[in-house]
Amino acid sequence: MSRTSTSVAASAKSQTIERAALILTYFSAEEPRKTLADLARQLDLSQSTAYRYIATLQAAGLLERDEQRGGYRLGPRVIELSFIALNQIEVRKHALDEMDRLRDRLNVMVNLAILVEGDVLHIAHAVPADWPRWYTAVGRRAVAHCTALGKTLLAHRPWDEVRATVERYGWRPYTSRSIQDFDRLAAELETIREQGYSIDSGERNQGTTCLAAPIRDHSGSVVAALSVSSKAERLTDAFREESLPHVRETADRIAFRLGYLGGTGYL
């Protein structure tokens, strides 16, 4: 095979992999099922060409046909890969027991998240026994600057990076309380850095309040955020004042497990 033929074959293979990967990214919590027409349109391909990529993903267990509702959904192999990926996140390994203890102490939902492409990605939850199990889900994403978890993470990133991220992905407000201008965002992130915690009062969901603190790794870098959340009427000012030390101490205990040795209330 000539160099030109080899180059063309490699390019075609690369394009195939890229398009197959793109198909997987088109599925979301809001759109868990896609028709062949949906995927062909998003790929800007004919349905016959799109189907070849879908068939390849089906064969690998990454997509499956939804026989009851029609269309396609993510396949069982994705669940297996997600489990593997979750178990490789170091902060999650060290956080789970601490999150359970915090949940039992305060009787609120406890959340753990990391920053991904301008969003927070939830990687663990500890839910009180009397809460509905469908209320939350690992893998859920939310706009970072609209959540206490996200603002905590953004507060420890360079401002130029934060601004560039928002400019790239947009404000995407959830409620009238969501931050939608750079001056307010910059001021709030500075306050969060100074006080060491963040509050979301109806910025993600009206009627819900969230309180978050940063988690550092052995180098001192903020790698995740921990939060407690509940109905706004439950997280009163008095309850926040009572619960904040426990939230920060739990975050510090997780950081200690990650090898962080300085500047924590726990130490």
Regions found by a protein language model. Give the residues of each.
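N-terminal helix-turn-helix
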Residues: 2-93, 100, 253-260
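Short, structured helix-loop boundary elements
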Residues: 13-17, 36, 71, 75, ...
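A structural signal for short hydrophobic beta-strand segments in well-ordered beta-sheet cores
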Residues: 63-65, 112-113, 215
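Amphipathic alpha-helical effector-binding/dimerization core
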Residues: 68-169
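Short helix-to-loop capping/linker segments positioned immediately adjacent to catalytic or ligand/cofactor-binding
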Residues: 101-102, 110, 172-178, 194-202
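Cysteine/selenocysteine-centered motifs that mediate thiol-based redox chemistry or coordinate metal-sulfur cofactors
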Residues: 161-164, 170-173, 248-267
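Extended hydrophobic
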Residues: 180-250, 266-267
